[in-house]
Amino acid sequence: MNWRLVEFLYLLFIWDHILVQPSHQDPAATNQHVSKEFDWLISDRGPFHHSRSYLSFVERHRQGFTTRYKIYREFARWKVRNTAIERRDLLHNPLPLMPEFQRSIRLLGRRPTTQQFIDTIIKKYGTHILISATLGGEEALTMYMDKSRLDRKSGNATQSVEALHQLASSYFVDRDGTMRRLHEIQISTGAIKVTETRTGPLGCNSYDNLDSVSSVLLQSTESKLHLQGLQIIFPQYLQEKFVQSALSYIMCNGEGEYICRNSQCGCQCAEEFPQCNCPITDIQIMEYTLANMAKTWTEAYKDLENSDEFKSFMKRLPSNHFLTIASIHQHWGNDWDLQNRYKLLQSSLEAQRQKIQRTARKLFGLSVRCRHNPNHQLPRERTIQEWLTRVQSLLYCNENGFWGTFLESQRSCVCHGGTSLCQRPIPCIIGGNNSCAMCSLANISLCGSCNKGYKLYRGRCEPQNVDSERSEQFISFETDLDFQDLELKYLLQKMDSRLYVHTTFISNEIRLDTFFDPRWRKRMSLTLKSNKNRMDFIHMVIGISMRICQMRNSSLDPMFFVYVNPFSGSHSEGWNMPFGEYGYPRWEKIRLQNSQCYNWTLLLGNRWKTFFETVHIYLRSRTRLPSLLRNETGQGPVDLSDPSKRQFYIKISDVQVYGYSLRFNADLLRSAVQQVNQSYTQGGQFYSSSSVMLLLLDIRDRINRLAPPVAPGKPQLDLFSCMLKHRLKLTNSEIIRVNHALDLYNTEILKQSDQMTAKLC
């Protein structure tokens, strides 16, 4: 055995076994690389790239076995050292190199190029030489596992992996029993692959001839291989060039020279290899890895949908009525099992996101010097809103083997594949502000019963209408004078007597058919005094007309401000007519034939007609006066003989309000209001007098509907409260109680939203 040991020590560095071979790999093996923690082996650059264990790992990883578990033991026989390399005096004691290796060195010459070094030395003998190692034998059990299959088979991959570890740890105690059990698991699940390895002399086994047993190099944490660069056996003038050539071969794949400048190292590519700085293979592998990670991300969502927790959640959702996003969200938050499963999904996706980000950063870092621009988009996590929409789609767009996406705004499905067969019958909506109480058992899309205050009609709930004849007993909203707008305009032009409302003209500043100076504000009122004289009527205004006469060559242009009191009261309880705003009409000015008089007409029509008790008209003038006359007052007696002042005078010969009166039964309405007020004060149930409540709600709505226009976003004026105050003589507290009772009935019983109003009286 001694002569074999001596021969090994002197020839170790020139044998194929001791020189680490360059990484030549066939194309079929290139696609079998793995990344992540094995990046140092990527791109054919690892010293053990052709080792049997690494190739086996690559093959198993390609098949989906991502986890490797190995248990082994070694039997060291010899510690060997390369004593020839330890010599320091290489000139006087030259190394016993093989003639072929010496001939290769001589062929290099004094100034070899990088390509000569690669072709002559590196491709044949490698880049490193073995200094010391351990020879002996090794036996090992290697097990490759696919955790995804273990998860599907057992339901808990962590416990399964731990059980396999415990089983494999008994390999050296009961080899036959352990292997038999592992092979059974391998055949039944297909989730593991088991390999036994036994090389070299093992233990104290009896061998007929120990020299006939080939020892192997042991490679473990206890038995390390010590390597050194091959340049130590070259002459000094070749050592630096060899190191540069080796780096160019390893880092640039022999397609350029590896150069470091200003702490920045890179490949200077040859003309025939302009992309030598671009690791195409690495980039393709990482892009493939990112694509697989994106698939894993999508599969994580499918795993949640296929989980028992999610299926149980879907079964518990009510199916007898329509589920909105808000109601599904409430059920989602109340399911604790689903919440725990969803948290596991979020944690796994967070870990997956970090892996994707790390790989993407490496990908973009590798492609800095490439013409190839990687195109990668990080997967986006599905939000809670998207999960709730997904639940809706599973409920209502999963029929006849087709799938689709549900649109709640349209209450319909968008089926995938261009068909319309995926939509199931959409249940009716109940609860909340909806009128339906229960869906129909015969057809779930239609309503089966309605809430109080509604009636069922053809599968829909409609508000219970108040009897029009009974409503007319309180206020006669419908009269014979409800003409169309064109008819009203024609009648106003003809000054039809049917539209006259006989009002009382009151003014301390103006006399009809008398000239006056309008340069200061003038006030006049047209009132009915219905609280005293016409108690059984309320009045509607549909137009106003004034006849204004001016002096010849007058430059005055009157301007009116009109305030309306709907049911009497003080001036502060009136509202101003917004001429030309929010669609409100303007004054129309028509000159009378052969006269200096004009008819000023305001036509409200059916759209802007409203209640009135008193109309206040404020008159000012827009006039173009000389600067000397602007400071003169318009007060004092009218002097028609003065030509300089006469041109400013005007007179109003006629003022008329057009409209009609509605019969008003104050006593009957007061009794209905007092009934509601008493019920509210005693805390009674509102639905006990639902007919009265519906009647008053209808009257309030029809009265407030005639309120004047307001700016967008602002509430309408409350005319109903003004009527209660001035025509029924209710106190403020009684008015508040009545309105509150009506609001409660509207929201609690009828499930309708209240319309905000602004206080006027």
Curated annotation (Swiss-Prot):
UniProt keyword list: Cell cycle, Cytoplasm, Glycoprotein, Growth arrest, Neurogenesis, Signal
InterPro entries assigned: BRINP, MACPF
Q: Which residues are glycosylated?
A: 156, 433, 443, 553, 599, 631, 677
Q: Which GO terms describe its biological process?
A: cellular response to retinoic acid; central nervous system neuron differentiation; negative regulation of mitotic cell cycle; positive regulation of neuron differentiation
GO CC entries: cytoplasm; dendrite; neuronal cell body
Biological role stated in the UniProt entry: Plays a role in neurogenesis and brain development. May suppress cell cycle progression in postmitotic neurons by inhibiting G1/S transition.
The superkingdom of the source organism is Eukaryota
What cystine linkages occur within this chain?
Answer: none
Subcellular localization is given as:
Cytoplasm
Q: Where is the MACPF domain?
A: 68-251
Query: Family per UniProt?
Result: Belongs to the BRINP family.
Record's protein name: BMP/retinoic acid-inducible neural-specific protein 1
Q: Which organism is it from?
A: Gallus gallus
Task: Report if keyword Glycoprotein is assigned.
Answer: yes
Extract the signal peptide range: 1-22
**Main subcellular localization, coarse class?**
cytoplasm
